[in-house]
Amino acid sequence: VDLILDVGNTHTCGVLIEDHGDANDGLRQTAELQVRSLSEPQYLNDPLFTSRVEFSEARFGKQHFSVESGRDDAFVWPSIVRVGDEARALAMQRVGTEGSSGISSPRRYLWDETPALQDWRFSQIHGKTQREALATAFPLMNLMNDDGQPLFRLPHEERLPVFSPQYSRSTLMTHMLCEILAQALGQINSVATRLRLGFPASPRQLRTLILTLPSAMPKQEREIFRQRMFEALALVWKAMGWHPQDEDFTTPKQREKSVVPVPEIQMEWDEASCGQLVWLYNEAISHYAGRTESFFNALARPDRQPEPGVVPGRALRVASIDIGGGTTDMAIVHYQLDDGVGANVKITPHLLFREGFKVAGDDLLLDIIQRCVLPSLQTALQRAGVTDAAALLATLFGDSGRIDTQAILRQQTALQLFMPLGHAVLSAWEQSDINDPFAGLHATFGDLLIRRPTSNVMNYIQQAIDHALPSGSPTFDIFNVPLQIQFSQLQEALLAGQFTLTTPLHAVCEAISHYHCDILLVTGRPTCLPGVQALIRHLQPVPVNRIVWMDKYQVHEWYPFSQQGRIGNPKSTAAVGAMLCSLALDLRLPRFNFKAADIGAYSTVRYLGVLDNTVNTLRDENIWYHEIDLDKPGATLDARLHFPLRGNVTLGFRQLANSRWPATPLYCLSINSAELAKTIAGDGVLNVRLKLRGSSKDSAPESFILSDAWLQDGTPVAADALTLKLNTLADRRHSGSHYWIDSGSVYLK
């Protein structure tokens, strides 16, 4: 069985493909990955589940019942986190305020390998002590250390189990993948799946794990992601007792010691190119009955000059924009037919351009909260008699940067009050009538909230408001605050560039119109909003009749996630596209020949330099290194260049030699020693030089590291006085190291 995973910033989905040898029948042996809730096992999640992670111990009953079955480890579950709806419910109902119990999405924090400051906690209250227990549980506590590193990688004398759980946020990805692996292993061998897919008597084994990656993910993060997947495999195999606990797991020979074969890991395809394959396959097979030539001929643009030596009408240039929850990705792929005839034609893809920005749906949600929800709350407070409502909101929901009980309450307020309100506004906008200029949302906070916030959150807000109200005034009811929005005003604001999503969309559409594409595919949940659709139509990167909106796109019954013959949620196209890629490699798609091996990802880091503090732009005078190529074996940086520093900086990159092109943060260069900081604050200037790590004749470089540093007068600086750390959190609006969903700071002055 092959498992295909698309781990997103907001949602994750998976597809399972079984290989029955000679009995294969196209796409019949596929199933969606379904995550079962462990606290209420009668419930299954939707195939598209949220990426939120919460610590929670899996309890299946007392241990001595397990012994009666003849196995003492029948109740072992190799993971201590939950994902999906169960994690969301646990986060919504959480009462404790002592430390964090979860995170909005581990993929956002792959870069952060520093141990956490506070211990992680399970998010249920323990009966006897009435406190939340620390997040350690058998079997994983004996397989990793306090920082979340697997013990089999450490030298023998350093192998200590978990005492205080301070796992770094990057290792939470390992925890999440452990949980998904455990669920997948349970599903492929469950009775229902075996009966449905045929051959109910044969046991199933995982053969490959295929992960799709966003275009916006830099090479360094990609390597960390591969590492986390490998660690999760090792931990699950050791926790289930399939591999000796203390043995190493790195080489294929050591992996052969395990009782159950270890699956291979594959990460080559990016999400945007995979999404195109779904459209290509469906058009060729369903609409043109397998006649690929007439399909290419019908859609090729007559006004684009063909390249020399290419017959007109035998090539197609497809662009796709994928606006997800955390990243906006775009790819332009050129598809070429070889000289076959009829259905016996092979399609060869060639990736022309790809780009990704870390601004997407969640930033749109924050904009909605700041434009609509908070101003109406502020007006209601002023009407009730609060003299300085702005200051009150800033202390309650602003960015104080402290980690204390108040910070946890602030994060829970964002999760339980503001995010549901923001989602309600967005879904009303999505379903509104485009032709009605007066369409809007007129309701109170209480009408829009399906589930009321917990008493802790209500007390936190209520006490602060009661203090600020003049004495003798009636109590303020937050559920009666009116919310009045006109959608036409939102759309005008989006077109005028007052939302953060507008800039990346402008950049992407500019690139697409430069390449004269034949078709533009638009996928992702935020593209269902009338405002976003209006913006793309207004920019018109291709003629409007050549834009395909994937949420309304009709697919036939072959599509695993289809709802009433349509792609219900366009997020699933990446996983299904990767499934088609994988089947095409084994020639398991009848009447559709596709050379999938050619869609490789390339690194988009071309220009590296210091980012501006306020907005993510990289000005030409701030560029340090030009024309970097991280895919070339033996690549090096120019050793003659060195750069002056006057404080902590953020290094970012962009792909094009154009200062308007949005840049993405990559590293933080910070000064550790207090003495060095004093010298620089005086009149010293620090000079720094970078180099590439892991570059040799055969292998391309992996990442940047500090080469050396010295002061103006030539004194060398010790290596530990400076740190160059990965930090790819997109926006300077977030307090340095936390995304707004995890810090709860939604109010900006």
Language-model features: locations:
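Conserved phosphate-binding loops in N-terminal lobes of ATP-dependent enzymes
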Residues: 53-212, 749
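Gly/Thr-rich phosphate-binding beta-strand-loop-beta motif of the actin/hexokinase/Hsp70
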Residues: 1-24, 126-146, 284-344, 522, ...
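Conserved phosphate-binding catalytic cores of ATP/NTP-utilizing and phosphoryl-transfer enzymes
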Residues: 1, 242-318, 587
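Glycine-rich phosphate-binding loops at beta-strand->alpha-helix junctions
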Residues: 206-224, 517-536
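Phosphate-binding glycine-rich/basic clefts of nucleotide- and phosphate-handling proteins
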Residues: 17, 26, 36-117, 332-474, ...
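Phosphate/ATP-binding catalytic cores across multiple sugar-kinase/actin-like superfamilies
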Residues: 172-201, 276-307, 464-516, 532-535
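Long C-terminal appendages of very large multidomain proteins
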Residues: 619-738, 745
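Glycine-rich phosphate-binding/hydrolytic loop that grips phosphoryl groups
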Residues: 263-285, 366-367, 548-606
